[in-house]
UniProtKB/Swiss-Prot annotation:
GO molecular function, one term: ATP binding
Disulphide linkage map: none
GO cellular component: cytoplasm
Organism: Trichodesmium erythraeum (strain IMS101)
Places the protein is found: Cytoplasm
SMART domains tied to this protein: Arg_tRNA_synt_N, DALR_1
UniProt protein name: Arginine--tRNA ligase
Example GO biological process: arginyl-tRNA aminoacylation
Family (UniProt): Belongs to the class-I aminoacyl-tRNA synthetase family.
Record-linked Pfam families: Arg_tRNA_synt_N, DALR_1, tRNA-synt_1d
Keywords assigned: Aminoacyl-tRNA synthetase, ATP-binding, Cytoplasm, Ligase, Nucleotide-binding, Protein biosynthesis
Motif 'HIGH' region per UniProt: ranges: 126-136
This enzyme's EC code(s): 6.1.1.19
Main location, first listed in the record: cytoplasm
Length: 585
């Protein structure tokens, strides 16, 4: 089913053209959902914006629009409010019919997009030989959620993990391990990621202090680049060890990714530089090959170039990012590229994309978006750190979330005098703990910093994952208590919206498709979180004010179906956020 707001736009388009002529073809009718029910369910704000063009008063324009508008099949007669707002209220019988259609459809009557795209999403992207930290949390779960929504909408999505698996650091680390711990370069089973991080720090210190070691490290990089067997073997061991550690976290968070690290693009780098040179875009600066761009300056106001080939002949991140961009467009056929990175990288990618545009590598039909995000802060308002001032390891954060969720659950079970199996406790604690972390992040506008608080994110009240999960669990409890077979009820669904709380709930259930379209365009998962939180609130109000199991037929079945549709909508919405539901909590 097409979202109501889209249906309205189509009807208003016709009304505008009929009333004012072909000059208004393509005019945005400015239809929005209202935030206050006293203004109806939807509002058209176009009359004010047309006043100057049509040389008439907004109210007069609004009247002409209404006189040519055909929406009587599902709206009450429109009302003009204020200077020229057109307020629209849905008819209950239309809402009932729509809900009945949605209930009978497995995908909640959400049709795939009419214009599927090849979308590449670059997210997570940790560095080999370094542990994933709290900063990787945002990129990983925001990218995963956007991928899920776009896939559900029918787009062809390629999820890419652009891991940092190449560069000088490998020369340093391999050289250091050859001296300090040669056994580590024979098998990937000897070291864990924590050992690699420690060795990396030691190798960096040695590199900064010892010129001979610097030369060895640089030679090791040359050996890697030329394919020396022992160097490549050592590099592959380090990569495999890191991959195993990363996969533990990806499995825990249920993240699916295709690894395509920096090394994948190595063979393409000379060609990128040669083409930029052929196009006359390269300039030499301090021995390096650069592209100078307008609008990028340092603190002194001097132009800052994008370096694509260093003075020592090596390439850097920018060259690799250009090669990746070209490959994703030319070989993968991407028409939408989404980079999920922290806000600190926005300037770098702006430079890369500007160079690519100047080179003619970005066709007009290709959209490139930097989905940037803010910092995770501690409760002191500063960047989240451990007590010793270290960066928080992501695995430690997730483990702590699960442990805290378990403690809360065990306390609640004790208070309720409930006995549950160890398997039940372990499963609920893991789902609630991980869901709380994901939802606390995704429910924030990704562009903002947010304060990380276990107490807030694990609360059973408020805009939290446990609150949403509990609303789902509540419906499952109704099903068990009344021995209800929802699948059977759905076949002959008949909805009756008798009382205000069920009417409000019914209207909200119709808006999922509209919200998913907004997420697809704006790439803001918090829009979906807001919808699901409001759904849970409206459901709880309905449940508290409208008897379900004790109602007489046919109202009883209608209300049961509203409960079922709420649960199905919550389950789908939470899945699109990367969150699993529970039958009991």
């Amino acid at each position: 089913m097409e979202p109501i707001v889209e249906q309205l736009k189509s009807r208003f388009d016709k009304a505008l053209i009929t009333a004012f002529g072909q000059d208004l073809v393509g005019t945005d009718p400015m239809i929005v959902s209202t935030t206050n029910p006293k203004f109806g369910d939807y509002q058209c704000n176009v009359a004010m914006s047309l006043a100057k063009k049509l040389k008439d008063k907004p109210k007069a324009i609004a009247t002409q629009i209404i006189n040519n508008l055909n929406i009587n099949d599902y709206f009450y007669p429109p009302e003009i409010a204020g200077p020229g707002f057109i307020n629209l209220s849905l008819k209950p019988e239309y809402i009932e019919n729509c809900l009945e259609t949605i209930i009978k459809d497995e995908k909640l009557n959400i049709s795939p997009t009419k214009n599927p795209q090849r979308v590449v999403i670059d997210f997570s992207s940790p560095n080999i030989a370094k542990e994933m930290h709290v900063g990787h949390l945002r990129s990983t779960i925001i990218g995963d959620s956007l991928a899920r929504v776009l896939e559900f909408q029918g787009h062809n999505v390629l999820r890419l993990n652009h891991v940092g698996d190449w560069g000088t650091q490998f020369g340093m680390l391999i050289s250091y391990l050859r001296e300090a711990f040669p056994e580590a370069l024979k098998t990937a089973d000897i070291l864990d990621i924590g050992d690699l991080v420690a060795f990396y720090k030691q190798s960096k210190k040695r590199f900064d202090e010892d010129q001979d070691f610097q030369e060895k490290s640089r030679q090791e990089v040359v050996n890697l680049q030329t394919g020396a067997e022992d160097s490549r073997h050592a590099w592959e061991l380090l990569c495999n060890q890191s991959r195993r550690e990363f996969q533990v976290i990806y499995d825990l968070l249920d993240i699916k990714l295709n690894e395509r690290g920096e090394s994948f693009y190595n063979s393409m780098l000379p060609g990128i530089v040669e083409e930029l040179n052929r196009l006359g875009l390269l300039e030499e600066s301090d021995g390096a090959q650069c592209v100078f761009l307008s609008g990028f300056t340092n603190k002194e106001g001097e132009d800052v170039p994008l370096i694509v080939k260093k003075s020592d002949g090596g390439y850097n991140y920018a060259t690799t990012d250009l090669a990746a961009l070209v490959h994703r467009i030319e070989k993968e056929g991407a028409t939408r590229l989404i980079y999920v990175t922290d806000a600190g990288q926005a300037n770098h990618f702006s430079q890369v994309w500007q160079v690519a545009k100047k080179a003619g590598w970005i066709p007009e039909n290709v959209e490139i978006v930097n989905v940037f995000f803010g910092l995770v802060l501690g409760e002191d308002g500063k960047k989240l750190k451990t007590r010793s001032g270290e960066t928080v390891r992501l695995i430690d954060l997730l483990d702590e979330a699960i442990n805290k969720a378990r403690n809360d659950l065990e306390k609640r079970l004790k208070d309720e005098k409930r006995l549950e199996s160890e398997e039940f406790i372990k499963n609920v604690a893991q789902v609630v703990g991980l869901s709380a972390v994901k939802y606390a992040d995704l429910s924030q506008n990704r562009k903002s910093n947010y304060v990380f608080s276990f107490d807030k994110m694990l609360a059973l009240q408020g805009n939290t994952a446990p609150y949403l999960l509990y609303a789902y669990v509540r419906v499952q409890g109704i099903s068990r208590k009344g021995e209800i077979n929802f699948e059977k009820l759905r076949k002959d669904a008949k909805i009756i919206l008798q009382d205000e709380p069920e009417l409000v709930l019914g209207k909200h259930l119709l808006k999922l498709n509209e919200v998913l379209n907004i997420v697809t365009i704006e790439l803001l998962p918090n829009r979906l979180c807001e919808y699901l939180y409001e759904l849970s609130e409206k459901f709880n109000k309905f449940f508290e004010n409208c008897p379900v199991l004790k109602s007489e037929e046919p109202l009883r079945t209608s209300r049961l179906l509203l409960c079922d549709l709420t649960a199905r909508t919550l389950k789908l919405g939470l899945y699109l956020l990367g969150i699993s539901v529970l039958e009991r909590m």
